[in-house]
Amino acid sequence: MPVNNKDINILGIETSCDETSAAVLRNGCELLSHIISSQIKTHQKYGGVVPEVASREHILHLQSVVEQALQEAKMGFGDLAGIAVTYGPGLVGSLLVGVAGAKAMAYGAGIPLLGVNHLEGHIYANFLHNPGLKFPLLALLVSGGHSHLVYFEGHGKYQVLGQTRDDAAGEALDKVARTLGLGYPGGPYIQKAALEGNPHAYEFPRAMLEPGSLDFSFSGVKSAVLNTLNSARMKGETVNVADVAASFQEAIVDVLVRKTLLALARTKAPTLVLAGGVAANTLLRERLTEATQKRGIAFSYPPPILCTDNGAMIATAGYYRYLDKDYAPWNLNAIPGLNLA
């Protein structure tokens, strides 16, 4: 594919947790390549991500993943306008691998380095999938470590309206799935088991917090499920795993939808976008689709491949930083506890 000198080609690199990913994006909307090296099978035997193992895997695979992305895009570093990389939040060792690699590549190629907040990256997956998105909009970001409601007035202009106070939705899903013996990562396993279950078999609590709050809390529902399972075990009773999974999923989705609708009513945002790993949950998509259609609100969500951690979303967020000339300094460092500012 010929390269036009006027094209803005961005290489995106993602290594915040257990996926080593790189993608080449042209002009913010044309994905030329997208490579993901997943570590799920490596970590499954441990029941979760082992940070030291994750960072070693990134070291082993980053160079080849980037080379594959460039080869598939039929480009070299000289064809790139900039290199975008996740610098937080995430596992510090994993982040350092990506940041160090991106800095070396960008410096060697003489092109800008673009630091991307991993959480922003998830939200910007929607701009890749739906380039026609208009502001203002509300974003519901739900992943393994984060649950946020964010109001966007424009690129780089946003306000966090609510966030998790304890366990994020994805974290709760992982812990319950592990206890049920369903496997890792928990979200897809809970969803699959729930298909055969009764979502009203158990009435698990919904933590709405104080009136009007847009924050989330999922530690209570997680604990309620674990207590139910422990109680049954102590009594020698069996539980229907599908019913527990379905009832638990129902409680999680119910809270997410109710809080999101409250935020939409408060902000009067005409558009809602869904992002993060839990955004791949079918029930959550269906409930939000139904609710937004009733209210005349536009609703966008990316395909599952763009919901989990990936380089394409980082390239997309990096593209908009490039347009604003918001380049990262060469002393950019990993910030594992980075928040949405």
Swiss-Prot record:
It comes from the Bacteria. One of its GO terms (molecular function) is N(6)-L-threonylcarbamoyladenine synthase activity. InterPro entries: ATPase_NBD, Gcp-like_dom, KAE1/TsaD, TsaD. GO terms for cellular component: cytoplasm. Keywords: Acyltransferase, Cytoplasm, Iron, Metal-binding, Transferase, tRNA processing. Signal peptide: none annotated. It catalyses: L-threonylcarbamoyladenylate + adenosine(37) in tRNA = N(6)-L-threonylcarbamoyladenosine(37) in tRNA + AMP + H(+). Binds 1 Fe(2+) ion per subunit. One of its GO terms (biological process) is tRNA threonylcarbamoyladenosine modification. It is an enzyme of class 2 (transferase). The keyword Ribosomal protein does not apply. Substrate binds at residues 141-145, 174, 187, 281. It is found in: Cytoplasm. Fe cation binds at residues 118, 122, 309. Its cofactor is Fe(2+). Required for the formation of a threonylcarbamoyl group on adenosine at position 37 (t(6)A37) in tRNAs that read codons beginning with adenine. Is involved in the transfer of the threonylcarbamoyl moiety of threonylcarbamoyl-AMP (TC-AMP) to the N6 group of A37, together with TsaE and TsaB. TsaD likely plays a direct catalytic role in this reaction. Belongs to the KAE1 / TsaD family. This is tRNA N6-adenosine threonylcarbamoyltransferase.
